[in-house]
């Protein structure tokens, strides 16, 4: 909807002061879009794909090369290779180059790192940081909370509705409850037992820990949870009070 491809059922939105319904033609001239699924022409070469998208916006590779050189420079040695023969990371760089070739004011990225290896993902976010420094506004849709935390502002959404908008730091700071991480030798059994622990408002697996959410209005001491778990024959129990992450905040908003 923000890229003016779909009409909204309700509400309104603007891109750079332009209405997404009334000014859709103007918006399409100032935005770049990289879909989640690789959708360039697989039978065209790297260079041919880039030339095609440049021609759509009446520009050339040479005219905007300075903007894409850090990204395109990494795949330029393979410019005669067909896009369908590129690796996942190289396809990603080509798609981003094509989205930038007309020097957009706003760049939309739809889950750009899904299915990409960790090294390429890290490189990609470093590229985005450099693009931001060049004055391009970047809007990223991502299912990865650690990636969301790299953004200046985030909107947590569920079923098309915005639950909260703020900086990552403020969203974590606004977490309204006490949060503890709990670890024992048997995490699945721990999670099952904690689901029946009445003092806990919520509990869920989080890596090698289980996060336990406690309402601040309830009297709670970690020692009481330790005793409760020992009575259930758990050993090597570790309980720590922690600050909330973006993912903790999102889970709480969903509940």
Residue ranges and their predicted role:
Residues 176-178:
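Interdomain coupling/hinge region of P-loop NTPase helicase/AAA+ cores
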Residues 165-166:
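ABC ATPase "signature
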Residues 131-134, 174, 196-197, 231-232:
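Alpha-helix C-cap/termination motif
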Residues 180-254:
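Short, charged/small-residue-rich alpha-helical element at the C-terminal edge
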Residues 23, 174, 249, 253:
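Residues that scaffold the ATP/ADP-binding catalytic core of kinase and kinase-like folds
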Residues 1-157:
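ABC transporter nucleotide-binding domains
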Residues 169-173:
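Short acidic-hydrophobic catalytic motif
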């Amino acid at each position: 909807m923000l890229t003016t491809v779909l009409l909204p059922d309700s509400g309104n939105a603007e891109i750079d002061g332009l209405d997404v319904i009334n000014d859709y033609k103007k918006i399409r001239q100032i935005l770049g879009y990289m879909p989640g699924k690789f959708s360039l022409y697989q039978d065209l070469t790297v260079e041919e794909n880039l030339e095609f998208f440049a021609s759509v916006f009446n520009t050339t590779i040479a005219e905007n090369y300075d903007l894409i050189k850090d990204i395109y420079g990494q795949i330029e040695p393979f410019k005669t290779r067909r896009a369908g023969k590129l690796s996942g990371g190289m396809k990603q760089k080509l798609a981003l180059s094509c989205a930038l070739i007309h020097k957009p004011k706003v760049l939309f990225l739809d889950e750009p790192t899904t299915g990409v290896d960790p090294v390429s993902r890290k490189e990609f976010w470093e590229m985005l940081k450099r693009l931001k420094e060049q004055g391009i506004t970047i809007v990223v849709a991502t299912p990865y909370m650690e990636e969301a935390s790299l953004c200046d502002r985030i909107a947590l959404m569920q079923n098309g509705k915005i639950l909260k908008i703020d900086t990552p730091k403020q969203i974590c700071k606004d977490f309204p409850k006490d949060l503890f991480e709990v670890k024992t030798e048997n995490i699945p059994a721990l999670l099952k037992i904690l689901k029946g622990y009445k003092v806990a408002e919520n509990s869920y697996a989080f890596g090698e820990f289980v996060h336990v959410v406690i309402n601040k209005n309830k009297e709670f001491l970690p020692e009481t949870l330790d005793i409760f778990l020992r009575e259930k024959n758990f050993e090597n129990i570790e309980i720590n009070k922690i600050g909330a992450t973006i993912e903790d905040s999102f889970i709480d908003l969903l509940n």
